[in-house]
Amino acid sequence: MSFPFTIGVVVIALMWIAGNVPNRTDVEWVKKGGGIVGDDHPPAYRFNAGQKMIYWIVVLGGGAIAASGYLLMFPFYVTNIAGMQLAQVVHGVVAVLFVAAMLGHIYIGTVGMEGAFEGMWDGTVDVNWAKQHHSLWAEKEIAKGQVSAPPPEGRMQAAE
């Protein structure tokens, strides 16, 4: 499972790096707790700060799991016994934190946020949902003509 896992992490890193570089909008998003603090959702582009955090957890955490896993798979090729012990601790701790983050991500993406599961299911989101949760992205797509003025039931292509 190590090689497919590593390939998956690399593919994810390459596919979505452009949209997941942190910016100033993300700082405001975090200050407002992603909309938990206050009455409205903070502005966000295609990926909000929470989604970017998950991306970096996958890329950096997955990279740490892969690197430490390879050290454990091929003992003593690169390191001594002390390095192997460190790799064991890093591998275990990062894997547990990774799984915890993914469980939180799965919850938010399914039952924790209305409309999120539908976006994953068919690749589109309701325009009104997009304007509420990713207002800067929705405005940009509407301005580009990707979506006409939003009817109440209108849908737009979700983040890929």
Role assignments for model-derived ranges:
Residues 1-160:
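Membrane-embedded alpha-helical bundles that constitute the cytochrome b-like, heme-associated redox core
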